[in-house]
A protein has these predicted regions:
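Alpha/beta enzyme core
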Residues: 2-228, 234, 238-267, 275-285
Length: 285
């Protein structure tokens, strides 16, 4: 199983690594079997699973629910739970409680939190209690209103210096890695070279130690214009649409279900008493 020590070793050995989001049992199982070393149960589930316009409405209960499902599906990947908006902002005590839920209730191995500044103190407290922490700097979606929207961060010298300082502070606080989102490539490379811990980029160019994408973006499940940093490796939205339309047509014209999908009471054919143990998950509604 991948551990935080393995992630550190990736950087030391110059081994680039992939991270993907996972929000449910089947996606986690599939990605785990594909060998993805880190799965992030991101608060982005609010947008791609729950239909919210931002991540802000996502609650800790939402996150724990999905994280539990991911934990049931993945057994080799390092599992990281994303602390949602207002689950760690009120106090250090609140942060401890929220992070503890991810570890105790949901079976996560680590937590992610956004921002620098006072978040550094929270990161230090959590790591001191044995809870591994992944930082997140640059375009931090929980600060979307303060940033005036989803905009690239760190373009000015002042912003860049602040991101670098926050990254060093998070490393000092004990974070095992840092996500750099929506920052110029040269800044991400500079931060990566300045740190002993790995950086994970999303919209941060090729100079980070690892890369992360939202699963639904990578699979082409999200529609409309994708952000510049997204590469769609397939287009499942089109595939699903085509399959659903074909299914509906076959039901309508009576070609589905055919004999091969039906049970028979004829003794020479399939026994009338179906072998329920042969019915895999997903076969029964």
């Amino acid at each position: 199983m991948t551990t935080v020590l393995d992630v550190q070793r990736f950087k030391e050995e110059g081994q680039r690594f992939a991270v993907l989001t996972a929000y449910d049992y089947l996606s986690a199982k599939t990605l785990d079997e594909a060998g993805i070393p880190i799965l992030l149960v991101g608060d982005s589930l609010g947008m791609v699973m729950l239909g919210y316009p931002t991540t802000l409405p996502v609650t800790m209960d939402d996150m724990v629910h999905h994280a539990k499902a991911v934990c049931r599906g993945a057994h080799q990947a390092l599992l990281v739970g994303d602390l949602p908006f207002m689950s760690y902002h009120a106090s250090v005590e609140q942060a401890i409680t929220s992070a503890g839920r991810f570890i105790q209730e949901a079976g996560m191995h680590a937590v992610k939190l956004e921002g620098g500044g006072r978040v550094v103190e929270i990161a230090q407290t959590l790591t001191g209690m044995g809870i591994p922490v992944m930082g997140h700097l640059g375009l931090t979606p929980q600060f979307v209103h303060q940033m005036g929207g989803f905009k690239v961060q760190g373009k000015s010298d002042k912003q860049a210096a602040m991101i670098l300082a926050d990254a060093k502070a998070l490393e000092q606080a004990g974070a095992f890695s840092i996500v750099l989102e929506g920052v110029p490539s040269d800044l991400a490379t500079r931060v990566t070279k300045a740190l002993r811990i790995p950086t994970i980029g999303i919209g941060a160019g090729p100079g980070t130690d690892g890369q992360v994408l939202v699963l639904h973006d990578m699979l082409g499940l999200t529609t409309g214009k994708a952000p510049k940093f997204v590469k769609r490796y397939t287009n499942l939205a089109e595939e699903i649409t085509r399959a659903a339309q074909t299914y509906a047509k076959e039901v309508g014209d009576g070609t589905f279900p055919g004999p091969e999908h039906s049970y028979s009471s004829n003794g020479s054919a399939t026994p009338a008493k179906a072998k329920l143990d042969e019915m895999k998950y997903g076969s029964s509604v």
